Amino acid sequence: MSKYKKYFNIYIVLVVFAVLGSLFYFLYSSYMAEKKQNNMRVFFDYHVKQLNKSIDDEKFSSMAISILLAQNESVQMCLLGQDRDECVKNIENLTKTLGAASMYNNIKLHLYDKDLKSYVRSWDLNRYGDMIASGRFLVQESRRQNKPMVGIEAWYAGVHIRAVSNVMHEGKNIGSIEVLLNYDSLGNFYKTQGIDLFVLLSKDKMPAHKSAPSDQILSEYYIENLSSANLNIVGILRDIDLKKYEFYVYKTHYFCVVPLIDASNTQIGYYVLHVNTDEKERNISQNYLESEELF
């Protein structure tokens, strides 16, 4: 009997050790998971500040360019002479010159006449004469306040960092010039840091939009930096309620969600930063999918 009691006691001790070991492992795992999440929150806090700083830098840069272009003699003369062909040639040359710098290789220029009608779009030379400025906050504010304006704005060409300056000649306003920068250079920069950037525009905040197959990648948002976005993680992104989460974890994937605010102080979408802490999986996913592969 004492022999069985001895084995029973040993069994009880082993069970207690197993329970305590499991409990310790659970508590340790929970602690490490919480510690990792806290570390990732600190990591994202830093990079959100860097993102905002980078956007501010691009705003400053685009405004400086718009001011210089507004003072460009060739731009002023073609507007004064109402010579659109000459303006087209000048805008093409200026776009090409600025685009030689890597951070401006996707720069767009938009020239307006004195009545704020579209005169030359560098990305669509055949489309002009439309009076779209009535719905454009920055263009209207620049004219109303008679000073350069800069901010983020969504319109037919998509979400851009936009800067608008009035073109003046002998004290008279003869037109306006707008500089548009997209988010691809920022997206590519973050890629080198092992971070994915998504610039998401709410579909119900887009006043006008040229349809494309990639519009269906996400049901509620347009991906505005499509060429630099990591489309391999779209499947996870689709399941995140961006209105609900500022920080989201799925397995080894960490997401930080930041409101995208336009020049009129209206939220029009989100910036999403993503990091995969699984280095092997992250390296494989660097071979980004083309948008067509999602359909």
Language-model features: locations:
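Amphipathic coiled-coil signal-relay and dimerization helices
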Residues: 112-113, 117-123, 162-164, 207-220
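Solvent-exposed, extracytoplasmic
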Residues: 86-103, 136, 147-150, 168-215, ...
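N-terminal signal-anchor/signal peptide hydrophobic helix marking the start
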Residues: 3-18
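Extracytoplasmic/periplasmic ligand-binding sensor regions of membrane-associated signaling proteins
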Residues: 100-102, 117-177, 243-249
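Juxtamembrane extracytoplasmic/periplasmic/luminal helical "stalk" adjacent to the first N-terminal
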Residues: 6, 19-81, 100-107, 147, ...
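A short, hydrophobic, proline-anchored segment that marks a local hinge/packing element in signaling
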Residues: 162-170, 182, 255-265
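Short beta->alpha transition motifs characteristic of CBS
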Residues: 122-125, 181, 272-278
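Extracellular/periplasmic juxtamembrane segments that couple receptor/chemosensory ectodomains to their
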Residues: 227-295
